[in-house]
Regions:
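N-terminal secretory targeting modules
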Residues: 1-151, 156-157, 161-163, 249, ...
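Conserved SGNH/GDSL esterase-like catalytic core that processes O-acyl groups on lipids
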Residues: 145-150, 155-241, 263-266, 271-273
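N-terminal Rossmann-like NAD(P) cofactor-binding module of classical short-chain dehydrogenase/reductase
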Residues: 213, 307-308
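Generic structural signal for well-ordered alpha-helices
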Residues: 240-244, 276, 295
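A short helix->loop->beta-strand "cap" motif at the edges of active sites that frequently abuts
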Residues: 250-254, 288
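Substrate-gating cap/lid alpha-helix
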Residues: 261-294
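A structured beta-alpha segment of the ubiquitous adenosine-cofactor-binding alpha/beta core
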Residues: 291-306
Length: 308
């Protein structure tokens, strides 16, 4: 997997994994929030310098270990973090993650054009695959003035954009904020606010950051809670209230997004409108900020000031 880095140069990295599904995918037939992963084994893992793109040679492969060992047996619902690994990623280059895992029911990340990811069942012929197990969090040891996280669905994750272009709003704001701010994108395709409420592990990861952007609503309106019906505006309001309450209790500043425009039919559009009318009251209740309008306006200078 070719992964863009936030800051170039030599840094100490750690990689976090959880063997539990963070959020419901599609209707939940294959994966749903809280589903336990199966037992699997990590045979080896490396990070490397991927050059400026997939046509470049992969160099500087560096082993990743877990408790001092290259091999790790992972149990269902286990969360774990790699040992520290130091690697230098030059300007404009990608960090490449490579590993060999064996088992069944391993939670994966649906990348969907975000980056180049390939897989092979026998290590010979590698083909494009946007459903592969990856670290849920990649962290580098850096001196920063502020930390920012975003939790939401595919609009936050960025999987609707052209492959490896990184022109979605979260990527743009990360670039605009510069090296003084560390940004963690916790968006997941198909995610609902109800998923975040049901999975404290996922929500707790973003609670460690100074400021958290909360951007849910679309999939709650379209699909609703896993094993449930489409959510009403009042139900989504309740989920968002729980999320913002949790984050503010943890000491986070919260920026709450409204539900963005979509090609909704009349009934769903009515839910979106009703939800957006309720969001300011949630923000006022907990001292959060609200971002109105489309996502592009967030990268304007006056909107970036919200983060500080």
């Amino acid at each position: 997997a070719y992964l863009p880095v936030e800051e170039y140069g030599e840094f100490e990295y750690k990689f976090f994994f959880t063997n539990t599904v963070d959020s419901t995918y599609s209707k939940g037939k294959i994966a749903y929030v809280g589903k336990s992963g199966g037992s699997y084994t990590v045979s080896n893992a490396t990070v490397a310098d991927g050059g400026t793109g997939v046509e470049d040679e992969i160099t500087n492969r560096t082993p990743v270990t877990f408790g001092g060992e290259t091999k790790k047996d992972v149990k269902p619902d286990e969360s774990y973090t790699s040992d520290t690994v130091t690697i230098n990623i030059p300007e404009g280059h990608y960090l490449v993650w490579e590993w060999t895992v064996s088992g069944k029911g391993i939670p994966c990340t649906k990348m969907a054009t975000l980056t180049s990811t390939t897989s092979s069942s026998d290590g010979t012929q590698f083909n494009y695959c946007d459903e592969i197990p990856l670290p849920q969090l990649i962290g580098a040891k850096r001196n920063v003035k502020h930390t920012l996280a975003a939790i939401g669905d595919s609009i936050t994750q960025g999987c609707q954009t052209e492959q490896m272009k990184y022109e979605f709003w979260a990527s743009k704001i990360s670039t605009l904020l510069g090296s003084d701010v560390a940004f963690f994108n916790c968006g997941l395709g198909w995610a609902r606010a109800s998923d975040a409420v049901a999975n404290e592990s996922w929500l707790s990861r973003v609670s460690e950051y100074d400021t958290v952007i909360v951007a849910f609503g679309t999939n709650d309106i379209v699909s609703g809670k896993y094993e449930g019906k489409k959510s009403t505006a009042e139900e989504i309001e309740g989920y968002l209230d729980t999320i913002v309450s949790y984050l503010t209790e943890k000491g986070c500043d919260v920026i709450l997004f409204n539900a963005p425009p979509q090609d909704f039919k009349e009934k769903n559009e009515a839910v979106r409108t009703a939800l957006n009318e309720k969001i300011p009251a949630i923000a006022e209740k907990y001292g959060a900020k609200v971002h109105y309008g489309n996502y592009e306006t967030l990268i304007q200078d006056e909107q970036v000031e919200l983060i500080y």
